[in-house]
């Protein structure tokens, strides 16, 4: 007999539908799986047989062939266990074939027949259309976020068999709540002093401008960066689904609702490999940190300590908002629309106090050159962060709260969307004159900086985008960008070099 059962596998951060075709025929008992299964799928033969027998069902004493169609593309993971087990029982005559119509099955089987959750249920459920989806109870909430059809959670293979045979109704339990992964957001009011850096955070959030914080150890660069997440608006439905699917595919914890709605914040260690940061791997296409930060903040602390090859791998994703990964038999595109924030010391020794740098010119040049010019050029904001003064540290008066600043950020983003349909960092040079025209005095200021070799052509475009955001943050629609907006944007393009040189426009 023959049976075809719907299921899905994970491919990068996307689900791919798979038809599990099972043929049971006379012959010496055997159990073969074909259709490019990987090692975890081949191992399912033993898991499935033990789970079926532990559930009280009879195992066919015939030749069993399982084909995973379509045969192109390697099938990975243990999520096909449940579909294979149901397919064997249908093809063997234990379950009527009519009972599995318009049903799809995802889940790993334990040897005792228990159903275990697998990573990537959200994108796999999204790939199965409007089919009713049978999943482990631990994956039900995640599946319901994206599934178009009804979700039927189960805890044991026996429950699924009894429901399909009509002996008992579907259990239809309430899904288990997911582990809490949405940690509280640190408040901006906790930052003492740092008026320029606080202003830079607000501008970065309002215009989605990449930002580099330059300062000595203990200046508060990490503290500032962690407050940026709270200034960003909640993700829209489309981006929230994309972020949820990426987190699900990577096996990362999801918030209790099952949907990633708050902008993610990822801070990988500087020893991270290219595969960890960008994504990929030798045997799978696992999302990297830049995809896990999709819709939020990717924070690279001690950015100059990352391997230059790893940093250069960020250039294409930052430009396109997606990561393209190619392997010999695999190709995937992962979402990677992030706000990049880097933090670094001004020199290898840290340069804590003015005139205290002990680094020679050669050491300083090597340190600075670890960040390539093309990557450095992608930072619209380069801000010097000094250690706060004693009076600022001892001041009992809190600064503006995250809620107050986030309201201004949201209003500025609304202005940009109404004007040009996107954030200001996405303005192409051809549209700057239309959407970010300069008043005459602002144009003279920019001209002066260019003539004195303090601003390049590409830097000029970035200054105009930042100035457009600063103008929007005034809270009132402004047709032109004022001189004061350009002056503030120029202040936020610090050079990288000796501490004494920081502050020059570049």
Pin down the residues of each PLM region:
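Conserved ASCE/P-loop NTPase catalytic core
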Residues: 34, 108, 199-366
């Amino acid at each position: 007999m023959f049976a075809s059962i719907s299921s899905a596998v994970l491919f990068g951060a996307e689900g791919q539908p798979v038809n599990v075709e099972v043929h049971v025929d006379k012959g010496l008992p055997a159990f073969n799986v074909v259709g490019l299964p990987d090692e975890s799928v081949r191992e399912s033969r033993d898991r499935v047989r033990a789970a079926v027998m532990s559930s009280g069902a009879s195992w066919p004493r015939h030749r069993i062939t399982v084909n995973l169609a379509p045969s192109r593309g390697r099938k990975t993971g243990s999520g096909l266990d449940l579909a294979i087990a149901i397919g064997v029982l249908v093809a063997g005559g234990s379950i009527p074939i009519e009972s599995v119509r318009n049903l799809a099955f995802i889940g790993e089987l334990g040897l005792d027949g228990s159903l275990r959750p697998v990573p990537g249920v959200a994108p796999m459920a999204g790939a199965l259309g409007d089919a009713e989806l049978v999943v482990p109870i631990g994956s039900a909430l995640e599946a319901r976020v994206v599934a178009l059809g009804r979700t039927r959670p189960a805890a044991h293979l026996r429950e699924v068999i009894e429901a399909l045979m009509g002996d008992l109704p579907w259990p239809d339990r309430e899904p288990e709540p997911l582990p809490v992964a949405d940690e509280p957001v640190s408040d901006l009011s906790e930052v003492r002093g740092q008026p320029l850096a606080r202003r830079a955070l607000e501008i970065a959030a309002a215009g989605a401008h990449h930002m580099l914080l330059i300062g000595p150890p203990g200046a508060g660069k990490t503290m500032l960066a962690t407050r940026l997440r709270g200034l960003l608006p909640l993700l829209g439905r489309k981006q929230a689904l994309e972020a949820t699917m990426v987190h699900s595919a990577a096996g990362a914890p999801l918030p209790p609702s099952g949907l990633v709605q708050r902008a993610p914040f990822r801070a990988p260690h500087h020893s991270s490999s290219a595969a960890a940061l960008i994504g990929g791997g030798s045997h799978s296409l696992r999302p990297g940190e830049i995809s896990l930060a999709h819709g939020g903040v990717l924070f690279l602390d001690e950015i100059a300590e990352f391997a230059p090859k790893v940093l250069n791998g960020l250039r294409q994703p930052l430009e396109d908002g997606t990561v393209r990964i190619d392997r010999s038999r695999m190709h995937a595109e992962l979402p990677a629309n992030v706000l990049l924030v880097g933090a670094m010391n001004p020199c290898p020794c840290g340069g804590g106090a003015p005139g205290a740098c002990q680094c020679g010119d050669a050491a300083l040049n090597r340190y600075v050159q670890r960040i390539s010019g093309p990557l450095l050029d992608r930072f619209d904001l380069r801000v010097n962060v000094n250690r706060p003064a004693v009076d600022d540290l001892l001041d009992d008066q809190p600064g503006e709260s995250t809620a107050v600043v986030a309201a201004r950020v949201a209003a500025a983003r609304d202005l940009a969307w109404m004007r040009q349909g996107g954030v200001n960092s996405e303005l192409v040079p051809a549209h700057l004159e239309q959407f970010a025209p300069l008043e005459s005095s602002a144009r003279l200021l920019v001209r002066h900086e260019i003539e004195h070799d303090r601003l390049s052509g590409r830097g000029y475009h970035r200054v105009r985008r930042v100035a457009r955001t600063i103008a929007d943050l005034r809270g009132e629609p402004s047709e032109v960008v004022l001189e004061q907006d350009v002056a503030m944007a120029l202040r936020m393009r610090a050079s990288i070099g000796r501490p004494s040189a920081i502050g020059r426009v570049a």
